Amino acid sequence: MQFTLEPFMNSFLPAGANRVDAILTVTAVGAGVMADKPQAVVGLILDISGSMQGQRMEAAKHATRKAIELIDPSAQFFVIAFSNHVWRVAAPAPATPQNKALAQAAVQRLEAGGGTVISQAMHQARTEFQQLPGALHYALFLTDGKNDTADEDYLTQELAACEGVFQCDCRGVGTDWQTKQLQKIATKLLGTAQIIAEPSSMEADFRAAIQNAMGRAVGNVRLRLWTPKSAKILSCKQMSPEIVELTNRAKPVDAQSFDYPTGAWGAESRDYHVAFQLMTGEIGDEMLACRAAIVYQNAGQEVKISAPPLVATWTEDETLTSRINAQVAHYTGQEELAAAIQQGLEAREKGDMDSATRFLGRAAKLATESGNDETTRRLSKVVDIVDANQGTVRLKSAVNKADEMDLDLGSSRTARAARKPNLDA
């Protein structure tokens, strides 16, 4: 696996300005040569509470058995089931045909019943993963209901303990679960949160998730930002393929360097938005804002891939200072789009239809302007888009709950910015 790190920014500041915004594009290509490619460990975590009875339970068992088939023979795997208790359905074991068959048989015997206590399932998953250190730890979590209210504080504590131990993709089947609960887990554990509206779609979703996990080759990759004493980091966010707030997850390396977690990587590309505050310079001054690098371990040695330094220059030339970097502008718009959707859905839930129409109209306009067709498609199931260019929409009188939840969860997914070859484009 080979990484590249490319910065995009307008490096020219007018007199008195002290903020620099940069987009850092990180790309990993090819399998590359990894001296000790880590083993993968896959955990499947299934909700078997009473609400899963019937079609959902049968679809979940079928999808899980199919997912087990897809796990690479070089990996290890385990299966956990939970309701208001937790069960080790299949202990961690190599993904041999025999072990897969035993696990599939155990999954088929599962029966639904009881409540929903997610913290116990996360604790058990963490325990299993910690038995196999140094591996790529991935979990696929499925639920169909709301977590027990009494468990929320325990879940928050457990997720803090799970952070950095494993990544987790979350799936909600049906519409009786809460999007914010799934997002809470996925965000903390660097995963995705998606709805499976119909049980019949579960197998295809599980298949895609497992195939994606099996394509990862490098784990615990960090974005390292070094700043001089004349600069400080204001924020750091992943912007593509979806928005993930990383600012408060920085780990100090030394007095001037911080690592931001990015998880495991396959062949892919992601964009990060970093904002800096500098000591204000004089016209003609140049100041280093940051040295950025991607850092990971290979054969016990730290590998570091550095970007060109991010340097700011103060100038009186308005043709230079008035430029808005295309990458920065694009992702600023994508962040505004996500916020508009959230504000619109919240207003709609409160019965403030005028505000909901205004916010979702703004979202339709931003989605169209940025070419975010996926978000436009989701919006069109909640509003009638009368004139996207003007942001004119009408709220639909009847909205499928699954479509509303899909728009909520999908609001953080962004359209990729067009690539530009230099810092000042």
Cite the ranges covered by each PLM segment:
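Beta-strand elements of well-folded, non-transmembrane domains
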Residues: 9, 26-30, 48, 227-229, ...
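Surface-exposed loop/edge segments in extracytoplasmic proteins
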Residues: 90, 232-235, 301-305
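Exposed acidic/Ser/Thr-rich ligand/metal-binding surfaces
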Residues: 4-220, 279-282
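Broad gene-expression machinery/nucleic-acid interaction feature
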Residues: 19-21, 39-41, 220-222, 271-273, ...
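Acidic, polar loop-rich interaction surfaces within structured domains
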Residues: 158-167, 179-297
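Long, acidic serine/threonine- and proline-rich intrinsically disordered regions
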Residues: 278-425
